[in-house]
Amino acid sequence: IVKEDNPNLMIITDDVYGTFSPHFRSFMAEIPYNTLCVYSFSKYFGATGWRNAVIALHEYNVFDRQISRLPKDKREALNHRYATLTLHPEKLKFIDRMVADSRQVALNHTAGLSLPQQMQMSLFAAFALLDKENKYKQKMQEIIRRRLQTLWDNTGFTLVEDPLRVGYYTEIDMLVWAKKFYGDKFVEYLKKTY
C-alpha cells in the first residue's frame, strides 16, 4: 500500500503486545519512514498501569514531511503555536510537537517522566537487551499461553488454534456459555438484569 498507493500514509502502531508473539515484526522495522511506534514496558514486565512507555519515530519521517508541505497559512499558525519553544519553530520535529502538546506548549519545560520512571524503563530495556537468548520472553509467552488455555479449559469450550494469537486477552460470549450450561431461562435473566 505504501509503495504503490500511498507513500504518505501515516501509520501509528501500538507494539505493546508484540513481545508476546513469537514471530512479531513491527511496521517500524519494515517501513520506519511512515511509522510512529508506541511501546510500553508495563505488560511485558508485569507493571501494568505504571505508564512506562515510549514513542518512537524515525529521524526522517512522513509526519515531518507532511507538516513541511502544509499550506503557508497552516504553517504560520503552527509557527505561532510553537514560537515560545524555539527561535525556529518551522524546524521543530513532529515528535517534539507531540511532547509540547502533551504539556499544553506553555508547560513544555515540565515534559518528561520522573527520574524513578526513567530509571525503571532503563533497567527494563537493559534487561531485555542483555537477555540474548530471550529466555524471559519465551517464559512470558509460555505463561500467557498456559493461562489462556487454563481459562478456556474451564469454560467447557474449545479454544480454536490461531497462529497470530497473542493470548493476553480473550473474548468469551457469556450468553453462549450461559445457554450451554444453564439454558434459555438463565440467558433471559442475564439479558434483563445486566
Task: Label every PLM stretch briefly.
Residues I1-Y194:
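PLP-dependent class I/II
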